Amino acid sequence: MRDFKTYLSAAPVLSTLWLGALAGLLIEINRFFPDALTFPFF
C-alpha cells in the first residue's frame, strides 16, 4: 500500500488528475454558461 501511495503522489499522476479535473470543470462551465467570452462586455 505504501508503494501505491508513492505512485499516486508522483508528478505525472498528479498532473494528469489535475488537468482532467480542470478540463471537466471547464466543460461543465461551458455547458451551463455557453459563450462566456461575451460576459465582460455586458
UniProtKB/Swiss-Prot annotation:
Membrane topology: Single-pass membrane protein
Domain of life: Eukaryota
Biological processes per GO annotation: photosynthesis
Compartments (UniProt record): Plastid membrane
GO CC terms of this entry: photosystem I; plastid membrane; thylakoid membrane
Keywords recorded for this protein, A-Z: Membrane, Photosynthesis, Photosystem I, Plastid, Transmembrane, Transmembrane helix
Protein's UniProt keywords contain Plastid: yes
Annotated transmembrane regions: 7-27
General function of this protein: May help in the organization of the PsaE and PsaF subunits.
Family of the protein in this entry: Belongs to the PsaJ family.
Protein name: Photosystem I reaction center subunit IX
Gene: psaJ
